[in-house]
Structures are given as structure tokens and as C-alpha cells.
Amino acid sequence: SYLFRKMIPVFKEAGYRVVVPDMVGFGKSDKFESKYDYSYEHHIEVMKELVERLDLKNATHFGQDWGGLVGLRVVAEMPDRFQQVIVSNTGMVAGKGAAAWITRRMVELAVWWNGPITFEELKTAAKDALNSENSSTSDGVSMFTKWIAHSYYSEDMDIVGIIETFGRLELSDGEKRAYEAPYPSGKYKAGAHVWPYLIPTQLKENEKYWQEVYEKWDKPFLVAFGGEERITIRMKDDFVNRIPNPTIITLGGA
């Protein structure tokens, strides 16, 4: 939730109630010490329970990064509680039948093939995908599987280094301490280490909700991707092509 520290006051001052949860394994939420205790499905169930306990109604869902992968499933499974959706630099990756199974196994194979990837190797792999105007889909896929391998095999991920490098930010000392505060040691970062590896584990389920909910969506849906986004931009087409009548904007300098 610390990521949204600059957005929250704006909405509060405008009179809105703002709910920004720390997902299990992150922030002030409880953390499993083993990466094998985490699952994509568990995160969805926890967020659904949060919505029910807070009895959220007529809510606006804003999803960025895992706020799409998890949040869009939450919205799809309890759509009556949400009046509109905003997505930014995220997606809900999906697949059909055998293709979904093959995609998952190919990702797992790529992670195994890459083996442990150092932070310096990851930055080198990301250079073309993030900085080139002409980066290809294969550049993005290669970079992303290396990112999964780096995080999966890490024992103590450099949280601040990841944020500064891939967010193109220069954090203050206070911000660095805040980002590292939830993780006294590497064992508390199991969630961060395994989450990217979990992305292809719900492809068929996600496709089901694309077809049953989002392709029939009749409420406001805003697609607001950054103009400089190089990785998740490939998921923007799903929203453009599968959501009926979405509003589409591009965020400059983001």
C-alpha cells in the first residue's frame, strides 16, 4: 500500500473512502516463510474475504500490477459490489485448454533453464525491453522469464534496487527504509520471491471470467496505461479488444 502513498490523500481530500490492502506476504500483512505456501488462488480468496468483511458496495476498483491479476478476479467473482473499474499497467493473463497448460509448463521450463539470475544480469536483459522504442515481443518475454527466474531463486531480493531500477526512480533514504521495513531478513520476502512464478497458474480460470464477466461488462471501464510502459503494455490489447466500449487514455511520463 505504501506504493500509493501519494494517491491516497488526493482521493481522501475529494471525499472518497480509500481501501488499499497489503496483500499477504507484503507490507504489514502476515507473511509465510516458505514460498510454497503461497498461491494465486489464495490471494484471490483473501481479497474476496476483505471485500466481504468491509462490506464494500458501489466500489471503484483500481488495479495496477497485481491489482489486475488478483483484483480483476475479485471483481469478476463479486461484480455486484463494484460500480466501475480502472486498470493501469496490468492485465489478467488467460489461456484456453491445452494452450494454457502448455504456456504454464513453458514458463516453468524457461525458469528452470535460466536458473538463478543475478540482479546485474536481470538489468542487462531488461535494457532492450525497457529502453528501446522498437523492442519486440520476444524481448519482453525473454526479459520477463528472466525476472521470474531472478525472483524465484532469490534468497534476499533487493527490493529497493528493483523499485529504483525498473521504476526509474531515485528514492529518498526515508522511502528506502519504508520499502524495506516489512522485511527484516530474506525469509520474510518469500511472497515477493514466488509471486511472478505464480502468474501462469490460473490461465484457464482467468479465461473463464474473461468470457463470462468482462466480455459482457456493462459498467464504466477505464484503461489508463503509461505512455512509456514497455512490459505490461502487451496486455493492454485484452482490455481494448475484449471489454465492451472501454474508455482508453494514455498517461504521459508514466
Language model: regions and residue ranges:
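Primarily extracellular surface-attachment and macromolecule-engagement regions
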Residues: 1-4, 10, 17, 68
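Flexible "cap/lid" subdomain of the alpha/beta-hydrolase fold that forms the substrate-access gate
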Residues: 3, 26-62, 66-247
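Conserved alpha/beta-hydrolase
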Residues: 8-34
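Short glycine-rich catalytic loops that host catalytic nucleophiles or stabilize transition states
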Residues: 249-254
